């Protein structure tokens, strides 16, 4: 009863004014509630919102538009959860939403790999902190279980990754890695 009441309230009070990760998580929660409680209105609101928010919030280089590697990991897990839901209830979610997830999740995994410290930890840009999002290893394991391939970077080979849309540049040489923010101030 409580979850139904909360979802009902949420369906009329989405955090559109905050946008970003707040609104995205609202849409995810409403989608799950809509599927579980077989509420077409909730599912429809959530799908419409996600179809708009995913391309808006995920840049072409795979970064979340808030430019925080920690929030990037959190929204990536949200996207994996939604994809997992689509696998469990294939007739309940649109092919359009599932296709969008299949398009963006690999880019997001690539960005997470590029931005991670050599020990797998999150890089501390913007308001990133340890211990908030699941670890890179856990996210990759989850993604692999859902059928997404992971291509780890070979840190022994020199490599420069220019994430032009987010402004982050990653350089790896002889096992050393430099990650810096070259975006406009």
Task: Label each residue range with its predicted role.
Residues 66-185:
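Carbohydrate-active enzyme catalytic cores, enriched for enzymes
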Residues 1-105:
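Aromatic-lined, polymer-binding surfaces characteristic
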